[in-house]
Amino acid sequence: MKDDPFARVIAAEAGAAIEEMKLTLIHNFEAMMVCCRAGVPIPIDDRVRYRYDSAVVADRCLALSSKMLKAAGSGGVRSDSDLLSFHLDILASQAHVANNSTPFASNLGGVLLGEENLDFAV
């Protein structure tokens, strides 16, 4: 795979996306800690965005691993494939309610469009 230009592009996309997601989560956590240390509530709009940012990670990782599987060809879908094993783990992670991004995306979209927050768990 390392000589395949398509695989190289996917590797670059995956690496950059993973770093972006990681930095977003770290930034969000640091922003929450600033509020906590100052003894002020974390603004609801920020909490709604943080919730979406964390839930969408599984979706983005699944899309990236799907591209990687496609680039791997038939070797990627064999039962002993490490890539397939990771892909299935990511897929399984979406079974947890915290990783189902659709309701969090809908809530964030509504908030961004001026609606009230509907997620009272944030």
Language-model segments: which ranges?
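Flexible internal linker/loop segments at domain or repeat junctions
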Residues: 1, 32-48
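Extended amphipathic alpha-helical segments enriched in small hydrophobics
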Residues: 1-34
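Amphipathic alpha-helical coiled-coil segments and their boundaries
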Residues: 7, 14, 43-46, 50
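Charged, amphipathic alpha-helical oligomerization/scaffolding segments
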Residues: 13, 17-20, 27, 52, ...
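General structural signal for alpha-helix termini and helix-helix connectors
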Residues: 34, 38, 70-74, 96
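Charged, glycine-rich active-site and insertion segments that engage polyanionic ligands
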Residues: 45-76, 83
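Glycine-rich phosphate/cofactor-binding loops in nucleotide/flavin-utilizing enzymes
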Residues: 74-122
